[in-house]
Amino acid sequence: MSRIAKSPITLPSGVDVTINGTDVSVKGSKGALSKTFNHAVSVSLEDGVVTVAPKNESKNAWAQAGTARSIINNMVLGVTEGFEKKLQLVGVGYRAQAQGKVLNLTLGFSHPVNHELPEGVTVETPSQTEIVVKGADKQVVGQVAAEIRGYRPPEPYKGKGVKYADEYILRKEAKKK
């Protein structure tokens, strides 16, 4: 069993945490995040240190406490440093262009794909074949990146499609006659 729940979270300067029962709100330079946790978990704040503990000793309560601790830690990291996911477009004529809260994608379809961005997420396109998704909420950043990748996942024969920058595409050999 992992012991993640037992390690406390030290808050960096400039981060404000408010706890109201099972609701935890974190404010920082990159924004504010809030989350409601399971009733089997108690969260406490003392002298700039957040501790998470299960209310009883059941396996489920410890699992929920570990999850809550990881989520709170990611909230603190998100409002201080932020999270980012890099995507690459591989293929002839595949392009991306950010226009405010909309990402315009040309992915070889007969029509352009316009992806609406949720609140708290920004997208940059350093080049026409690169996309950088940034935000304070790790889950939302990952979800947006997965949705963008889902429009044209990489195929195994030529490697064409939208892929994560650090993703390795397992290539297949073409059928031999």
From Swiss-Prot:
A GO molecular function annotation here is: structural constituent of ribosome
Keywords per UniProt? Ribonucleoprotein, Ribosomal protein, RNA-binding, rRNA-binding
| Family from the record | Belongs to the universal ribosomal protein uL6 family.
Q: Which GO terms describe its cellular component?
A: cytosolic large ribosomal subunit
The annotated subunit structure for this chain is: Part of the 50S ribosomal subunit.
- Gene Ontology terms: biological process: cytoplasmic translation
| NCBIfam families assigned | L6_bact
The answer to whether keyword Thylakoid applies is: no
Name of the protein in its database record = Large ribosomal subunit protein uL6
Q: Which HAMAP family match?
A: Ribosomal_uL6_B (MF_01365_B)
**Short name of one Pfam family for this protein?**
Ribosomal_L6
- Coiled coil ranges: none
Q: Which domain of life is it from?
A: Bacteria
**Role description:** This protein binds to the 23S rRNA, and is important in its secondary structure. It is located near the subunit interface in the base of the L7/L12 stalk, and near the tRNA binding site of the peptidyltransferase center.
Q: Would you indicate the residue range of the signal peptide?
A: none
